[in-house]
């Protein structure tokens, strides 16, 4: 089992548990976190995976200081040179085993994308969800466009994406974004019980069912990923993106100019 710096991976029988482990940064994602998520999903031999975050957050999205400031121009260049579904998204969307998100706190930005890439979402009463990309002058990733719409319908998805609004666990349940809401103390026991129930079934049949759901419901994520990365490459270069990031870091209201 690999040693990781920003995630923790453990196995309980046939269930693998991935915990994002940057609590001081509210489990914000760095380039290292993305690489480790990609590796652990690709190399795990578990029959069911659980993804969660170390309290107090599930995942607060990209680490703005690393990914959206000084590194922003490099990210844009990389996306422009090779528009494709990002490796972490590809690993999560294409794994042949079920993935359950145990959402223990805020799941915003790519943290919400991560939750949406799971097959099932169980959340604590402390959970919050938000597709905040529009607030940074960006578009969301593939799960926000496809999976969110599958779960809550086009109209509710459009409202969440266009506004960047944050919703609580109760609202998420009403919208059918999550399968259930439990107390914070019950989150991991409930999620692990479900994961072990799934992992106890014949693995080949479970994998075939997952493949069938993907075939029946999902778009071509590779094609959608190319569209997303091409769009992000352009949006990373806009004044509105720079203003969205600066306003967030300065804790002030943004002023967008449409360019």
Model-derived segments and spans:
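Conserved CoA-thioester-binding segment of acyl-CoA-metabolizing enzymes
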Residues: 1-54
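Crotonase-fold acyl-CoA enzyme core
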Residues: 7, 90-204, 237-238, 243-246, ...
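Terminal peptide-recognition signature
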Residues: 18, 22, 37, 51, ...
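Charged catalytic carboxylate motif
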Residues: 32, 36, 84, 91, ...
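Glycine- (often His-adjacent) and acidic-residue-rich active-site loop
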Residues: 53-91, 107, 137, 220
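Hydrophobic alpha-helical core bundles mediating ligand binding, dimerization, or RNAP-core interactions
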Residues: 82-89, 195, 213, 225-232, ...
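Helix-loop "lid/cap" segments that line or gate small-molecule binding pockets
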Residues: 160-161, 198, 212-216, 230-236
